[in-house]
């Protein structure tokens, strides 16, 4: 996730913003870290974006759970976004980026219903490996995300993420 965010956030946020991606070793480590970081971060004008894979969770319940962890810090300038269902769904939503990253032709797949709504794919990583057998999560994230177009992605969760980040950075800071 960090690799992708490091590459795509500069395409979304103004140049006047800086950001830091903090990876966590698993979802429980992230959940434990949220209240600590949101309460303890003393630097002024800091905004938090928390990104979490949906996997098999109920999206709305997961998002509510993460916002509840933030509530105790009284920090309002925080955005929670859920990737449905895996990060690879975002890649499958932009097959042009996959084509460019792996120098292959995927035009036969672009019209398929499955790739017009990649968020419904239960195992996006496996589906991506069917298209790109050499795909590996970390190197593949770097390879594909550098070609991602933030304005042309069939993943609804990606588009909601982009929209949320844009709205967060245009709001006045506390």
Where are these regions (language model features)?
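C-terminal accessory helical subdomains adjacent to catalytic cores in phosphodiester-
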Residues: 2-22, 28-49, 54-174
């Amino acid at each position: 996730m960090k690799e992708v965010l490091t590459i795509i956030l500069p395409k979304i946020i103004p140049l006047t913003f800086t950001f830091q991606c903090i990876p966590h070793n698993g979802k429980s480590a992230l959940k434990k870290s949220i209240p600590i970081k949101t309460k303890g971060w003393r630097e002024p004008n800091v905004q938090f974006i928390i990104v979490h894979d949906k996997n098999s969770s109920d999206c709305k319940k997961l998002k509510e759970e993460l916002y509840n962890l933030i509530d105790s810090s009284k920090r309002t300038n925080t955005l929670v976004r859920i990737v449905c269902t895996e990060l690879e769904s975002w890649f499958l939503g932009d097959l042009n980026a996959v084509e460019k990253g792996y120098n292959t032709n995927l035009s036969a797949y672009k019209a398929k219903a499955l790739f017009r709504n990649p968020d419904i794919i239960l195992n996006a990583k496996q589906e991506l490996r069917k298209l790109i057998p050499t795909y590996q999560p970390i190197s593949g994230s770097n390879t594909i995300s550098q070609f991602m177009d933030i304005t042309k992605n069939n993943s609804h969760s990606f588009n909601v993420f982009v929209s949320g980040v844009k709205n967060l950075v245009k709001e006045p800071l506390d």
